[in-house]
Regions:
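Ligand-binding loop in jelly-roll beta-barrel domains
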Residues: 92, 103-131
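Small beta-barrel nucleic-acid-binding modules, principally OB-folds
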Residues: 54-63, 68-71
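Glycine- and acidic-residue-biased ligand/ion/polar-headgroup-sensing regions
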Residues: 63-64, 73-88
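Histidine-centered metal-chelating micro-motifs
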Residues: 66-69, 87, 99-108, 126
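A short, N-terminal "cap"/entry segment at the start of jelly-roll beta-barrel domains
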Residues: 1-53, 133-143
Length: 143
C-alpha cells in the first residue's frame, strides 16, 4: 500500500510524497505501460513515473546468463546494484556498486548469476542498438 500526501508543486502538476512497500508493487514484463518493452526473462517494478520530468524509477531483474548488448538511449540512467552481479566495463559489480550511462554507447552488460538493480531514467528509456551487436557478443564472465 502506498502512503500518499499530495501537495501542489509551484512548477506545475501535483507531485506526491510516496512511501511504498516493495511487496505491493508487482513485477511486470513484456510491454510495460507503454514506457518500455522488455526482452524475454527481464522484469521490472515501476516505483514512480513522472511524465512531466520524464523520470522513471524502477527495480529491474535480469535472469542468470542474460547479456544486454552495447547500446545507447536518448536519456541518462543511474543504476545501483542491489542483488547479484553485473559485469560491465571490465568491472565485476556487486550490491552497492554504481553505474551511470548517457547517450553515448555503453555496455555490454552481463549478468552471469542474475541481478537486481534500482535504476532511474531521465528521458526516453528506449534502448537503441545495432542488430549485429545482438548477435556478435560472447559472454566473457563466468557464473
Amino acid at each position: 500500500m502506498a502512503i500518499k500526501a499530495a501537495k501542489k508543486s509551484r512548477r506545475g502538476p501535483s507531485h506526491t510524497f510516496r512511501a511504498i512497500y516493495d511487496r505491493d508493487i508487482p513485477w511486470e514484463s513484456d510491454d510495460v505501460r507503454g514506457l518500455l518493452t522488455l526482452p524475454a526473462g527481464v522484469k521490472v517494478k515501476v516505483l514512480n513515473y513522472d511524465p512531466v520530468m520524464k523520470r522513471l524509477d524502477m527495480k529491474q531483474r535480469f535472469p542468470a546468463g542474460y547479456v544486454e548488448p552495447r547500446h545507447t538511449h536518448k536519456s541518462w540512467h543511474s543504476i545501483l546494484v542491489t542483488k547479484g552481479r553485473m559485469c560491465v566495463a571490465g568491472k565485476d559489480l556487486r550490491p552497492g556498486d554504481y553505474v551511470f550511462g548517457w547517450d553515448i554507447p555503453h555496455g555490454p552488460y552481463e549478468y552471469p548469476d542474475g541481478c537486481e538493480v534500482f535504476i532511474v531514467y531521465m528521458g526516453d528509456a528506449t534502448h537503441v542498438w545495432e542488430k549485429e551487436d545482438l548477435l556478435k557478443h560472447r559472454n566473457i564472465w563466468n557464473p
